[in-house]
């Protein structure tokens, strides 16, 4: 997959937050990944009440899903991140996770504050759209 990030100087510097303003992708297979949360392989929450731990676990789960689809995190064109309102005042853990998992050519990303997710212990959920060759 070919992916090219565009970050016009007329838009704010989103790279400091770990995402690109625009991503143009070319490939032949589209991968849609359901929202990933901080569950381990047994369905147990990782990092209850801890946005940092939950963010990193959700991103690890996303990486696992991409491998299962035959791709890598580098193939992700866009992310949609849902953050519970109670945790949205300090989003540094989310930024830190994005910078750690997408250090180069990060995907386009939308952050959405929500009143709650599927379970009360979830603070973040991340869904992805990728393009593979």
Tell me the role of every PLM-derived stretch.
Residues 1-60, 64-77, 84-133:
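N-terminal presequence-like segments and the immediate start of the first folded domain
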């Amino acid at each position: 997959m070919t992916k090219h990030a565009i970050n016009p100087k007329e838009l704010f510097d989103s790279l400091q937050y770990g995402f690109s303003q625009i991503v143009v992708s070319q490939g032949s297979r589209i991968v849609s990944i359901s929202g990933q949360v901080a569950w381990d392989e047994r369905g147990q929450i990782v990092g209850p009440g801890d946005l940092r731990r939950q963010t990193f676990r959700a991103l690890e789960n996303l990486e696992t899903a991409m491998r299962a689809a035959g791709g890598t995190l580098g193939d992700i064109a866009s992310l949609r991140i849902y953050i519970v309102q109670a945790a949205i005042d300090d989003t540094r853990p989310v930024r830190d996770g994005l910078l750690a998992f997408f250090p180069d050519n990060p995907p386009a990303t939308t952050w959405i504050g929500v009143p709650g997710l599927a379970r009360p212990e979830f603070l973040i959920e991340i869904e992805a759209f990728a393009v593979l060759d």
